[in-house]
């Protein structure tokens, strides 16, 4: 079991929206990666200096494995480590950790039309695996994700 990160005081705070750095760290640790293998990886992100030290090797690992790709803006490729993460972004990253070949059922949630094209395949795969079940026939792809929701997702993926 890994020690929690991202909160100055040792409190879980499940209702708090999770930052991208916290999410990357949780997923990398859930994957049980040997982070020492990635210490020398060069990151292409123009905002790499904003990645907290406690999450740097996790971000390097996730980038090296093709799980984290970043986003582009006028300055170049960014990781936005300190920003919060949307449910669609998180589900895309979680989907990239999975083997291929899972069923990809049609999304029948009432807000399925709000799922970005780049996230749809990953989301369908997670629905097919039973990881994503929705709530009140909604998946809220553009809402932010809380620390508690991430813990529940990672537990469902065990």
Task: Place the predicted regions along the sequence by residue.
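Tandem repeat domain/solenoid detector
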Residues: 64-66, 128-130
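Hydrophobic core segments within long, regular secondary-structure runs in both alpha-
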Residues: 59-60, 120-124
């Amino acid at each position: 079991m890994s020690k929690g990160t991202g909160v100055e005081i040792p409190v879980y705070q499940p209702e708090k929206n999770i930052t991208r750095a916290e999410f990357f760290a949780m997923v990398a640790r859930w994957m049980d990666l040997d982070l020492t293998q990635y210490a020398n990886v060069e990151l292409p992100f123009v905002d790499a200096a904003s990645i907290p030290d406690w999450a740097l090797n996790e971000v390097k690992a996730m980038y090296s494995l093709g799980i984290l790709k970043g986003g582009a803006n006028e300055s170049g490729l960014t990781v936005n480590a300190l920003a919060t993460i949307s449910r669609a972004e998180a589900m895309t990253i979680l989907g990239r950790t999975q083997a291929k070949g899972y069923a990809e059922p049609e999304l029948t949630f009432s807000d399925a039309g709000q799922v970005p094209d780049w996230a749809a395949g990953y989301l369908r795969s997670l629905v097919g695996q039973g990881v994503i079940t929705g709530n009140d026939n909604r998946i809220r792809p553009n809402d932010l994700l809380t620390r508690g929701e991430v813990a529940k997702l990672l537990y469902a993926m065990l």
